[in-house]
Amino acid sequence: MNPASISFVRSLRLSDYPSGSAITFHDGKFFVTGDDATTIQVLDKDLKPDTSIPISDYPEKRIPKPIKPDYEASAMMMLDGKPTLAILGSASTAARKKLLLLPMDVPMPRPVSFPTDVFITRLLAAGIREINLEGMTMIGDRVVIANRGNLAYQENHLILTTPGFWLHQDTASFAVCRPDVSAFINGFTGLSDIAYLPDRDLLFLSFSTEDTTNAYDDGTIGLSYIAWISKPAGKLSGPTCKPDGMIVLRDVSPAFNGQKIEGLCATPGPDDSVTLHLVADNDSGDTGLFELRLV
């Protein structure tokens, strides 16, 4: 499948949930993670708040920037035969080099935390000069992690590794592929999330522009984009990969003006269509949600 048209379905705001940065779908529910939030917000299939899952003991709703874990990426994985929500910190500071696991076979999972510093050190030694992990998905038996560049380091990366890499960080295999979007846009735009839909064999990538020259500071928000790669398993083995298509979200709906898309998830829709759910964090303390239909 190669999407021929993209239509805007709806948008809404989670005014009581801060800084949405990742979204994952499992068993009829959406799991939204905020980069400075103390809980995971669970939504039902109609995007209505269902419950929340605590992931931090910090007493306020938002964790201050210098100490926040900066959870920017999430993915559903099968670990030891159980569906498990994995949430990854950006690793842009020492406090952010961590990963959470939440088993989905219990009503209120207790998160288990793992450091990722050894794995991050190996990525730096392999030539990735700056780490800012922003997305994660599963393609077959591989974990794919998105690393975002910035205006001073204009490289995005897809890091391919194995489930459980956090348990054997010093030996876990990995490979790196750089997505090349130069055929679609001029200038640099940062990779903000990835989502693979096995039912359609499509990898979706979100990008956004932000006026910042490092992995820590926020900047003025520009345009956001969605790109896709069909049959990605065979296309991520080289040093670079090129999307099959890419669109600027402002052209889909004016609702995307001034929105910094941070996360996305893809689910199969009717008649071979695809439904995309996007989350936006505009550094204002709430979360934007958007729904698109691709046919």
Which role does the model predict for each range below?
Residues M1-V295:
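Sequence/structural signature of beta-propeller domains
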